[in-house]
């Protein structure tokens, strides 16, 4: 199964990242990194709801996004809208102008109830507004499966943020279900326990401009 980037609804004019050749990431990180949400939207986080939370890890090496309603399910009666939901978040990133970051990998946390023959997948597209490049992560699990999960994937390539103190960073994440058994059922939803969200941890690499 392949993740179709088109189904995340990104027009070519919204394309992604700053196309700069890969370099060895720096071991140091900036002492400041803040996020301000510009907007969010999608079937899994309508723009008029407060269903997305985000923060920067204390070491500035990851961004954590928590989704309250990023869920998908499949059975004999579900529609395509039930079987896939997405959430696009546009963040204003502010930091030091002599550093750039790139998405290195993503880890997804949630809860799955999957019969045999059912597959659930997470995928994300990352890009910086005004740049013509993008990166993505995509990973999944197959049934039979019950309980909380952790799924990891490395970014398919490095795209680096602009050298500047503030810039828009876009993350479009979806969850989807597929099945090769018409009688099977499946659901990917919020993690069981106190956290109670679908969580995405975006690991960052840094380098100096």
Swiss-Prot record:
Region described as Disordered: spans on this chain: 171-195
Protein name, as recorded: Uncharacterized secreted protein ARB_00107
Secreted among keywords: yes
Signal found in the keyword field: yes
Secretion signal, residue range per the UniProt entry: 1-19
Pfam families: DUF4360
Record: glycosylation sites: 69, 183
InterPro entries from the UniProt entry: DUF4360
Cellular component per GO, a single term: extracellular region
């Amino acid at each position: 199964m392949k993740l179709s980037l088109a189904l995340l609804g990104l027009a070519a004019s919204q394309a992604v990242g700053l196309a700069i050749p890969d370099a060895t990431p720096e071991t140091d990180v900036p002492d400041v990194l803040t996020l301000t949400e510009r907007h969010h939207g999608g079937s899994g986080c309508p723009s008029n709801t407060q269903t997305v939370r985000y923060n920067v890890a204390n070491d500035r090496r990851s961004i954590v996004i928590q989704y309250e309603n990023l869920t998908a399910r499949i059975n004999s009666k579900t529609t395509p809208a039930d079987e896939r939901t997405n959430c696009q978040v546009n963040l204003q990133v502010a930091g030091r102008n002599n550093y750039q970051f790139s998405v290195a990998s993503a880890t997804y946390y949630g809860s799955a109830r999957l019969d045999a023959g059912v597959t659930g997948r997470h995928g994300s597209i990352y890009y910086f507004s005004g740049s013509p490049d993008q990166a993505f992560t995509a990973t999944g699990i197959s049934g039979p499966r019950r309980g909380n999960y952790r799924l990891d994937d490395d970014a398919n390539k490095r795209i680096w943020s602009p050298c500047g103190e503030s810039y828009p960073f876009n993350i479009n994440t979806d969850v989807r279900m597929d099945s090769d058994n018409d009688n099977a059922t499946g659901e990917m939803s919020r993690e069981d326990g106190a956290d109670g969200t679908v969580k995405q941890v975006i690991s960052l690499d840094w380098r100096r401009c």
